[in-house]
Amino acid sequence: VTGSYIKGSATDGSSPVQIIGRETIEDLGATTIADITRNISVNNGSENNPDSFQSGSTQGLSNVNLRGLGLSSTLVLVDGKRNTVAAATANDGSVFVDTNSIPVIALERVEVLTEGAASVYGSDAVAGVVNYILRRDFTGAEVVVSQQEADLGSQTDNRAGFIVGTEIGNNNFVLAYSKLDRSPIPGTAISQYNQFGSSGFGNSFLVFPP
């Protein structure tokens, strides 16, 4: 369990851990890690919007903001190890780990330490810790192909990915790849963005008729 070397349930002790397992991930139909992040109960204020008008330099990237304390206050681990931060910065200038760099098909589960853990991990874990556990022991081959369509407009997500793994001696070798092709959707196709006027510059520049 994240934050402890002692075996026990996810609710043992004063710092409970929320776990999103592989079965839940598949039930969500998640195409990116951002889709999983939205289901973390204490996530608040992360910049996971694919809209270029609202996301700025973080378009296509994913991050976690536990309890709304800032991206730099949430520690992101991959298999219990720290990861490098993204080249882009958030709208407030803070740095973060791009979790969308992890293929969904390679993810075993997500462990979220929902309370501050600065005493264990340092000041960058003031809000908590998110640990992405990969399918390191996977053997065989798995391929996924899916298509999702938005309720509004004509936007579609086409996803393809694979994972292969083999065991050689005492070592496991796993290779995973995932690609998401998301078609654009104009603001005019969404009713709340197209009320009483129209604009090609996004909702911020909506023009109202006289």
Q: Model-derived features: where do they sit?
A:
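N-terminal periplasmic "start-of-domain" segments of outer-membrane beta-barrel proteins
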Residues: 2-28, 34, 86-91, 141
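Short aromatic-centered micro-motifs
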Residues: 76
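Short loop/turn motifs at secondary-structure junctions and domain boundaries
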Residues: 11, 65-68
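Surface-exposed beta-strand-turn/loop segments characteristic
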Residues: 35-41, 45-61, 69, 81-210
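Surface-exposed loop and edge beta-strand positions of immunoglobulin-like domains
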Residues: 23-26, 67, 100
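Conserved catalytic motifs of the protein kinase core domain
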Residues: 73
